[in-house]
Every structure is written in C-alpha cells, then in structure tokens.
Swiss-Prot record:
CDD domains: GRX_SH3BGR (cd03030). GO terms for cellular component: nuclear membrane; nucleoplasm. This is SH3 domain-binding glutamic acid-rich-like protein 2. PANTHER family: SH3 DOMAIN-BINDING GLUTAMIC ACID-RICH-LIKE PROTEIN (PTHR12232), SH3 DOMAIN-BINDING GLUTAMIC ACID-RICH-LIKE PROTEIN 2 (PTHR12232:SF4). Keywords: Nucleus, SH3-binding. It is found in: Nucleus. Its main location: nucleus. A motif (SH3-binding) lies at residues 61-67. GO terms for molecular function: SH3 domain binding.
C-alpha cells in the first residue's frame, strides 16, 4: 500500500499550505514513500477523499480540508492527527507502516 497525501495546490489559505508542506517535508526527510494527490486538479480524487473519510472524522460543517492522509484505502487522519503522532514519535503506526529499525552507529 502507498501512503497518499491529499493536498490542494491552489489553496488561498497560508495555514493549509504550511500544513501540507510540513507533512510532505516530513515524509521526504524520513524517506517514506508517498503519493501527493492534488484535489484541485481532479474532481474524482476530491470526491474519493470526501467519501472515504469516516463520518466521525468529518467537520460538523463544510468539507474536510487538506491535508488528509491515507494508506491505500485506509484513512490515517488529518494534519492535527499527523502532528500529534509526530510529537509522540508514532508516525509509522499512524501511517500503518512497520517501524524502521533504529540505526546502529559503529564504534
């Protein structure tokens, strides 16, 4: 399965852009394979994202905002959930990935 990050390249909100960049940079820095899906360029992808976010995770009003993170068809969470997992050092679990073994430094 591939981690997919749903983003909006044409967002006018600086906060959304920063959150999207934070997720993408973290995944790149940790060499986690992922696909960036731009929902502003594909109505089909936008509808898929909306449909596959569990009802209890959707906002009371309006549509969920990017970034939204999936592993295959499994919903991982939004930016706030990602940030919490980053702070608690549980990103691999959050993404549904096996943790990488800690690197061992040679003496």
């Amino acid at each position: 399965m591939v981690v997919r990050v749903f983003v909006a390249s044409c967002s006018g909100f600086v906060a959304i852009k920063k959150k999207q960049q934070d997720v993408v940079r973290f995944l790149e820095a940790n060499k986690i394979e992922f696909e960036e899906v731009d929902i502003t360029m594909s109505e089909e992808q936008r509808q898929w994202m909306y449909k596959n976010i569990p009802p209890e995770k959707k906002p009371a009003q309006g549509n969920p905002l990017p970034p939204q993170i999936f592993n295959g068809d499994r919903y991982c969470g939004d930016y706030d959930s990602f940030f919490e997992s980053k702070e608690s050092n549980t990103v691999f679990s959050f993404l549904g990935l096996k943790p990488r073994p800690a690197s061992t430094a040679e003496p």
